C-alpha cells in the first residue's frame, strides 16, 4: 500500500494471521489494524472468527479516523479447520472498495470439492495464496498465488516482479517440479478421489 496523505498505509487483519504477515509489515513498512476475537469465541486467537458485521464496524471505525485500509487479510481455513464466511466478507469489501486477501494455506483442496465453490477466489476474494504442500502432493514450500477478477493488480508481469523481490534467483527446481507434477495430478481425476476420501472420513 502506498502512503496516504503522508500517513503509513494500514492493513486490516484478523489476529490469527501467520507471522509471515508481520515480516511483510516490517519489510514494507505498513501498519496492521487487528481484528480481535470476541471473548466468548471458542478457540479464541487460533480461530478468530470475523463476521460481516464485525468487518463492517471495523471499516466504519477506520473511516471515522480518516483511514482506509489498502486490504483486508483473513486466514481461512484457520489452524483448527474453521472456515470464514468468505462470500459475506467479500461483499463487505466490495461495498467499501477494499480488496479481500485470503491466506488459504490450509485449503488448497477447496477448489476441487463438488462445484468448486468453496475456494476463496470463487467466493469473491481479490487475491489468495494456497500452500500446496499442506494439503496437496507438493514438496514443502510449494505454493500458489491466485488473482481474482477484482484483484488490485491484473498485470501478471507486475505480480511476478513483486514476487521476485522476496524470492531467490536460485529457486528450488525440486519444489517447482513438484508443483508441475501436482498440477498434472489435479487434472487427472483428483476431484473424484477427494470426494471418495471425504466419504471415507465421514465413516470413521
Can you say where each PLM-predicted feature lies in the sequence?
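Conserved PLP-enzyme active-site core in the AAT-like
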Residues: 1-204
Amino acid at each position: 500500500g502506498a502512503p496516504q496523505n503522508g500517513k503509513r498505509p494500514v492493513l486490516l487483519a484478523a489476529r490469527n494471521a501467520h507471522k509471515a504477515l508481520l515480516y511483510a509489515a516490517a519489510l514494507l513498512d505498513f501498519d496492521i489494524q487487528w481484528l480481535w476475537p470476541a471473548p466468548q469465541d471458542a478457540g479464541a486467537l487460533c480461530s478468530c472468527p470475523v463476521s460481516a458485521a464485525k468487518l463492517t464496524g471495523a471499516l466504519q471505525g477506520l473511516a471515522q479516523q480518516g483511514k482506509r485500509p489498502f486490504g483486508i487479510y483473513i486466514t481461512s481455513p484457520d489452524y483448527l479447520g474453521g472456515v470464514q464466511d468468505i462470500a459475506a466478507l467479500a461483499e463487505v469489501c466490495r461495498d467499501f472498495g477494499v480488496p479481500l486477501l485470503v491466506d488459504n494455506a490450509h485449503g488448497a483442496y477447496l477448489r476441487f470439492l463438488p462445484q468448486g465453490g468453496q475456494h476463496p477466489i470463487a467466493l469473491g476474494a481479490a487475491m489468495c495464496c494456497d500452500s500446496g504442500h499442506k494439503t496437496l502432493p507438493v514438496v514443502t514450500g510449494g505454493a500458489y498465488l491466485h488473482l481474482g477478477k477484482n484483484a488490485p493488480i491484473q498485470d501478471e508481469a507486475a505480480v511476478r516482479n513483486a514476487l521476485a523481490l522476496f524470492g531467490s534467483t536460485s529457486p528450488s527446481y525440486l519444489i517447482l517440479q513438484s508443483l508441475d507434477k501436482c498440477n498434472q495430478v489435479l487434472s487427472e481425476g483428483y476431484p473424484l478421489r477427494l470426494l471418495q476420501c471425504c466419504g471415507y472420513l465421514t465413516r470413521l
